[in-house]
UniProtKB/Swiss-Prot annotation:
Monomer. Binds 30S ribosomal subunits, but not 50S ribosomal subunits or 70S ribosomes. HAMAP family: RbfA. One of several proteins that assist in the late maturation steps of the functional core of the 30S ribosomal subunit. Associates with free 30S ribosomal subunits (but not with 30S subunits that are part of 70S ribosomes or polysomes). Required for efficient processing of 16S rRNA. May interact with the 5'-terminal helix region of 16S rRNA. NCBIfam families: rbfA. This is Ribosome-binding factor A. GO terms for biological process: maturation of SSU-rRNA; ribosome biogenesis. GO terms for molecular function: ribosomal small subunit binding. The keyword tRNA-binding does not apply. Keywords: Cytoplasm, Ribosome biogenesis. It comes from the Bacteria.
Length: 120
């Protein structure tokens, strides 16, 4: 399958999952704390590697969120997410959602903090 088509399917899956996380998921471990950063669909359309970013705490004194707990909660709802993708995206076979954490936001915050510390 052409790379452009796979990217289009990935973007569509990302749109649906983002919408579901925002509007339908009620789990407090996930709601408002997680965003979808990327979806990579395999060439055979069997899997959609979905990368989730965990938003950092708003205040610096708040404790960090437990990534393992959030990852577990996401894995619990991946069947529901796949069902919603099947309902909204018009493809013959709906890929299995594979949950992966994207730590790029955390890494960017750490780098920014280090740079700010150097300026002081």
């Amino acid at each position: 399958m052409k790379k452009q088509r796979l990217e289009g399917i990935g973007k569509e899956i990302m749109r649906v999952i983002s919408k579901v996380l925002l509007e339908e998921v009620k789990n407090p471990k996930i709601k408002g704390l997680v965003s979808v950063t990327e979806v990579d669909v395999t060439e055979d359309l069997k899997f959609a590697d979905t990368y989730f970013s965990i938003l950092p705490p708003l205040k610096s004194d708040e404790k960090k969120y437990d990534h393992e707990e959030i990852l577990e909660a996401l894995n619990e709802i991946k069947g529901f997410l796949r069902k919603r993708v099947a309902e909204e995206v018009d493809i013959r076979y709906t890929p299995e959602i594979r949950v992966k954490l994207d730590n790029s936001m955390e890494n960017a915050i750490k780098i920014t903090k280090l740079l700010n510390d150097l300026k002081v």
